[in-house]
Amino acid sequence: MAISRLLIENFRNLTAVDLEFDHGFNFLVGNNGSGKTSLLEAIFYLGHGRSFKSAVSNRIISYEQPHFILHAKIQEQAHQWSVGLQKLRQGNSVVKINGEDGNKIADLAHLLPMQLITPEGLTLLNGGPVYRRAFLDWGLFHHHNHFHLAWVNLNRLLKQRNAALQQATHYQALEIWDRELVKLAHQVSEWRAQYAEALRPEIEQTCRLFLPELEISVSFHQGWEKDSDYADLLVRHFERDRAIGYTVSGPQKADFRFKANGLPVEDVLSRGQLKLLMCALRLAQGEHLMKQKERHCIFLIDDFASELDQYKRALLAERLKQSGSQVFVSAITETQLKQMQPQQHRTFRVEEGCIAPL
């Protein structure tokens, strides 16, 4: 998958941008605040329907403009698509694929599998379980056709159950929710466990390359006691859940944990080591998608040189070259990118929201 052309209107300081990209490496060079991250953010938004910088769309739309528009030409093998997303200041979104209305953000996300590597991305390792569940669920979204619907229904049922807990005086009032909830919880947890196990060899192999001095291990935790029946657990924990006001145990509490030499990685690794591990995880997941589905991810890398020495930057660059993926990389100077100079690439200078090829 690759973006061949991108048009941007009124997205932060990018008021009018029309760019053609290389299917390999694309370098974005410019000072802090010039618009490099905004371009990566626009690409990410097109593939996710949300920003990785802000949850408030009005902060993304250019000042005094009613909306922003993102439009791209994308290619995968012999197939081509034209995709567009318009976000109104009132909050509404319009998604078009090949000129047709009525599409959803999930349709865009399926067309544009992306991996994001940013300095803030360390939350995957030192943040809460929600970030690691999202990591697993991203993979399942692209591997299992039925996962997204199951995930949506699971979250809907949990919200309904939590609302019912506020009014319930006895467990029987929740049985209507729990019969379906238990089925979906087992299905989603089984998919997550299978995916985590399938991904584990890829992660361990990539970690040996990036962090050979450490023994990295991974483990999946489903969100409730491993040997407990989830239906029985919901009955037994009714009074506790009712007192707290929400469902404490279940797939919404699942986690995917990482250890280095037997200890939690967030406790023992430096920031540089954490970034390398995060890069290894993103690369492993992208390579797993390629092996299983023959689909390339698009890699978005913000502030390439941050936290990495020259040798590690060269190592990451070589692994990205081998992946065959389209890659977008931002840096302050071209010197920071000298380890990443494949034959096929394009460099753009970014200055105060203006982007021009060099």
Curated annotation (Swiss-Prot):
Keywords: ATP-binding, Cytoplasm, DNA damage, DNA repair, DNA replication, DNA-binding, Nucleotide-binding, SOS response. Coiled coil: none annotated. It is found in: Cytoplasm. It comes from the Bacteria. Gene3D superfamilies: P-loop containing nucleotide triphosphate hydrolases, RecF/RecN/SMC, N-terminal domain. ATP binds at residues 30-37. One of its GO terms (molecular function) is single-stranded DNA binding. GO terms for biological process: DNA replication; DNA synthesis involved in DNA repair; double-strand break repair; SOS response. PROSITE patterns: RECF_1 (PS00617), RECF_2 (PS00618). One of its GO terms (cellular component) is cytoplasm. The keyword ATP-binding applies. The RecF protein is involved in DNA metabolism; it is required for DNA replication and normal SOS inducibility. RecF binds preferentially to single-stranded, linear DNA. It also seems to bind ATP. Belongs to the RecF family. This is DNA replication and repair protein RecF.
